[in-house]
C-alpha cells in the first residue's frame, strides 16, 4: 500500500472591502509551467470552496501538465455576471502582471455576452493591455480546433485543447501613428554667374 500526499496552495486577492476578487491562485507543483486564465466575472470560489468552473480549470490545467493556475476575470466585481462595471484599472493591472509571469494565458470569458456593450468594452480593455503578451495568448477549443472562445463550462470544451489567439481576432487595434522626424531643408546655394575671361 502506498500513500500519496499532495498540497493545493491557494491565494485569493480581494479589494479592501471584499467586493472584488482580482485573482485566485492555485498551486500544486511549482516545478511545472504556470497557466493564467481570464474568465467572465468573479464568483464565490475562494481559498476553500470550489465552484464547478474552478474545478474544471484546475483539473484541465493539471491534465495539460501545468503546476499552477491564476484565475482572473473581465470583471473583478463578485457575481457581476451582467457586467455593470466597466472601469477597473486595478483589475487590468493584475491581469497584465499575472500574464507576464505565466507560460500561457487562456482568454476564456465565453461568447454568451458577446453582444453586451459592457462585455465588448471590458474585452477590448483587457486584450489591448495584453498585446505585449500576445505570443502566449490562447483560447479553448475542441479536439478538432472548433468551438473556439468558449467558457470552461461549455460542454464542447470541458476537456481542454488550446488554440493560439490573436488580439486582432476580437478587437480593432488602433493604428499607431508615428511622428516622422521632419527633414531638414538645406538652404539653396546661390549660384553667381561666371564671368567670361576676355580673350587676349
Residue ranges, per PLM feature:
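Active-site and ligand/interface coordination hotspots across diverse enzymes
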Residues: 1-51, 192-200
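Residues at the starts of beta-strands that form the adenosine-phosphate
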Residues: 34, 67-68, 104, 136
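Short, glycine/serine-rich, charged loops/turns that create anion-binding
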Residues: 42-44, 76, 112
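Glycine-rich anion/phosphate-binding loops
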Residues: 48-53, 86-90
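Short catalytic helix/loop segments, enriched in acidic residues and glycine
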Residues: 54-62
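Short connector loops at secondary-structure junctions
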Residues: 66-82
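Glycine/proline-rich loop-helix segments at beta-alpha junctions forming the active-site rim
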Residues: 79, 84-200
Amino acid at each position: 500500500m502506498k500513500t500519496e500526499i499532495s498540497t493545493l496552495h491557494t491565494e485569493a486577492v480581494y479589494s479592501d472591502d471584499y467586493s472584488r476578487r482580482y485573482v485566485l491562485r492555485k498551486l500544486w507543483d511549482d516545478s511545472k509551467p504556470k497557466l493564467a486564465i481570464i474568465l467572465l466575472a468573479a464568483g464565490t470560489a475562494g481559498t476553500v470552496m470550489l465552484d464547478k468552473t474552478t474545478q474544471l480549470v484546475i483539473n484541465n490545467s493539471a491534465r495539460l501538465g501545468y503546476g499552477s493556475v491564476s484565475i482572473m476575470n473581465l470583471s473583478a466585481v463578485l457575481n457581476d455576471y451582467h457586467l455593470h462595471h466597466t472601469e477597473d484599472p486595478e483589475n487590468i493591472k493584475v491581469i497584465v502582471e499575472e500574464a507576464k509571469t505565466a507560460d500561457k494565458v487562456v482568454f476564456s470569458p465565453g461568447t454568451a455576452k458577446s453582444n453586451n456593450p459592457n462585455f465588448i468594452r471590458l474585452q477590448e480593455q483587457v486584450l489591448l493591455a495584453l498585446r505585449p503578451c500576445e505570443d502566449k495568448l490562447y483560447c479553448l477549443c475542441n479536439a478538432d480546433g472548433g468551438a473556439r472562445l468558449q467558457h470552461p463550462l461549455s460542454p464542447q470544451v470541458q476537456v481542454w485543447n488550446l488554440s493560439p489567439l490573436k488580439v486582432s481576432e476580437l478587437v480593432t487595434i488602433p493604428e499607431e501613428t508615428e511622428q516622422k522626424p521632419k527633414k531638414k531643408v538645406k538652404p539653396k546655394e546661390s549660384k553667381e554667374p561666371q564671368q567670361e575671361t576676355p580673350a587676349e
